[in-house]
Each structure stands twice: as C-alpha cells, then as structure tokens.
UniProtKB/Swiss-Prot annotation:
This is Translation initiation factor IF-3. The gene is infC. SUPFAM superfamilies: Translation initiation factor IF3, C-terminal domain (SSF55200), Translation initiation factor IF3, N-terminal domain (SSF54364). It comes from Salmonella typhimurium (strain LT2 / SGSC1412 / ATCC 700720). The lineage of its organism: Bacteria, Pseudomonadati, Pseudomonadota, Gammaproteobacteria, Enterobacterales. GO terms for molecular function: ribosome binding; translation initiation factor activity. IF-3 binds to the 30S ribosomal subunit and shifts the equilibrium between 70S ribosomes and their 50S and 30S subunits in favor of the free subunits, thus enhancing the availability of 30S subunits on which protein synthesis initiation begins.
C-alpha cells in the first residue's frame, strides 16, 4: 500500500514539544541542577545549546527534564543493553549417557566431553541406563557414577546424586565449580 499513514512508534521518553507540564525540574548537559523553570524557558535553553529537552521522570512533581542530545542518549542506551546481553551466559544442561558396561576407551571420550561442558560453564547430566539383566547389578552402575564423580571432583560439584534407581536409569547432575 503506497502512501499509507506511518504510525509513529511511542518513545519511552517525551521530548521537546511532547512535554505537557507547565514547570519542570531542569538538569543541564553535564548533569548539573538548574532548578525549577517554566517549560518555555527550558525549551529555549535546550534550543540555545542545539540539543533536545528530554523528560526523564514524568511522575515526579514537577517532572524532571534534562538537556541532552536524544539521538546520542538512545545510542548509548542501546549500546549498554547490548553489552549487558553479551555478558549474560545462558547455562545449559548437557547430557552424557553411560551404561554399566561402558569400556575404558568410551569412558575416557565421554569424560573429556564432560570436562569440556563443565569448563564452558554448563551443567552436566549423567544418565546411566540399564538394559535387561543389568538391572540385577545396580551396584556396578553406582560404581560408574562414583568413578565419574571422583574423576571430576576438581571441576564440578555434585548437585544431585541418585540414591535409588528411577525406572531403568540413574541420573546424576554436576555443576561447574565457581572460579575464584
């Protein structure tokens, strides 16, 4: 549809002529307090400086307005929020499956994977699955889980350790130790 009306997106802060208050508490470019002034006077000061008058806290009495470059303000705000998102790490739970009869070579490969997960800051879920007659030898499964726990004691803290078998499997959860 050509020439349609563009809906202006609502800004989080009112600027310049959008401000409705008669009097405002004014803050200068450098953050200095300029006192309570009329809206007209505040707009004139902002225009003199060649920047915008931005309503910072509309619910205050009188509303707090600041003389600033609004475009630069938005840019800095989005930049800082992107930085915060970058610093946040989502912790995932990675799962490795063992069997009571897992051979030494396979055990070492799975152990290396567990070490990598824990070093990356993720939690590790170790599932020990029993099949058929293996159910009769649950102590072998416990030995495997204890061996994993002992091999990773420098890197991880046990969050949950199975006391009994759940269905046909035992589950242990490890969390990485906090770095000093």
């Amino acid at each position: 549809m050509k020439g349609g009306k563009r809906v202006q997106t609502a800004r989080p802060n009112r600027i310049n002529s959008e401000i409705r208050a008669q009097e405002v508490r004014l803050t200068g470019l450098e953050g200095e307090q300029l006192g309570i002034v009329s809206l007209r006077e505040a707009l004139e000061k902002a225009e003199e400086a060649g920047v915008d008058l931005v309503e910072i806290s509309p619910n205050a009495e009188p509303p707090v307005c600041r003389i600033m470059d609004y475009g630069k303000f938005l840019y800095e705000k989005s930049k800082s929020s992107k930085e915060q998102k970058k610093k946040q790490k989502v912790i995932q739970v990675k799962e490795i499956k063992f069997r009571p009869g897992t051979d030494e070579g396979d055990y070492q490969v799975k152990l290396r994977s567990l070490i990598r997960f824990l070093e990356e800051g993720d939690k590790a879920k170790i599932t020990l699955r029993f099949r058929g007659r293996e159910m009769a030898h649950q102590q072998i499964g416990m030995e495997v889980l204890n061996r994993v726990k002992d091999d990773l004691q420098e890197l991880a803290v046990v969050e949950s350790f199975p006391t009994k078998i759940e269905g046909r499997q035992m589950i242990m959860v490890l969390a990485p130790k906090k770095k000093q």
